[in-house]
């Protein structure tokens, strides 16, 4: 597991209050991890802070799964 993947998963666990073993690459924040729209906004903000990047709204809307978050951060580091 890459450092980025570990950090993204840690943020998801902290922000959504889910178990680490539930944070699988294909897991949807809303459908599988029980996030609501506010949770997803806060999650994006936490990712921006952790990785010192800015995620535009149109990109943030596409980040709906754990793998999508990992991929976005990996490409935009």
From Swiss-Prot:
It is found in: Cytoplasm. 4'-phosphopantetheine is transferred from CoA to a specific serine of apo-ACP by AcpS. This modification is essential for activity because fatty acids are bound in thioester linkage to the sulfhydryl of the prosthetic group. Its main location: cytoplasm. Pfam families: PP-binding. The modification O-(pantetheine 4'-phosphoryl)serine is found at residue 37. One of its GO terms (biological process) is lipid A biosynthetic process. Residues 2-77 form the Carrier domain. GO terms for cellular component: cytosol; membrane. The keyword Lipid metabolism applies. GO terms for molecular function: acyl binding; acyl carrier activity. Pathway: Lipid metabolism; fatty acid biosynthesis. InterPro entries: ACP (IPR003231), ACP-like_sf (IPR036736), PP-bd_ACP (IPR009081), Ppantetheine_attach_site (IPR006162). Keywords: Cytoplasm, Fatty acid biosynthesis, Fatty acid metabolism, Lipid biosynthesis, Lipid metabolism, Phosphopantetheine, Phosphoprotein. Carrier of the growing fatty acid chain in fatty acid biosynthesis. Belongs to the acyl carrier protein (ACP) family. This is Acyl carrier protein. The lineage of its organism: Bacteria, Pseudomonadati, Pseudomonadota, Gammaproteobacteria, Alteromonadales.
